[in-house]
Amino acid sequence: MKILLSALLLLVTFPAVVGTAAATVASAPHPAPAIRLFSWVPADGFPDRFPYGQCTWWAAYNRHVTWNGNAADWLANASAQGFHTQPTPSVGAVAVYRPGGGYSALYGHVAVVIAVGRGTYTVSEMNFIGWGQVSTRTVRWPDPHIEGFIPVREEDIP
């Protein structure tokens, strides 16, 4: 009841704040089920040991990830486990971004490539626009902030 009254008070005094406050309260205690990006992703996503809400969680949910580490370390860690890495985007690849340049200066960022066009690629990502929020964006190619890509392996597609 107290929350309802507070929300009503916010609605009357600051209508622009209500949507943000409600979204934060609703998503914090119990994360909503995620939507698979590709038909070959298991119904509940791939097993995932990364913290919910982070970019690494979303990428690992939609890709078979066997390595650990912060986003900035994913390219090297995947390569060390024998995964192929490449300098160009492909559908299903994990895009690994360098720290800084609009991404976390300490941890870097990862996203999943969902489309590749002429001079662009489109990614699905979590925690780019806010904690726990999934968004898509189209990026111009070549991208100076990209470290590289981890493409899908045939054996990772059931």
Regions found by a protein language model. Give the residues of each.
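Intrinsically disordered, low-complexity
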Residues: M1-V65, P87, T120, Q133-P158
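Secreted/periplasmic proteins that engage bacterial cell-wall peptidoglycan
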Residues: P29-I129
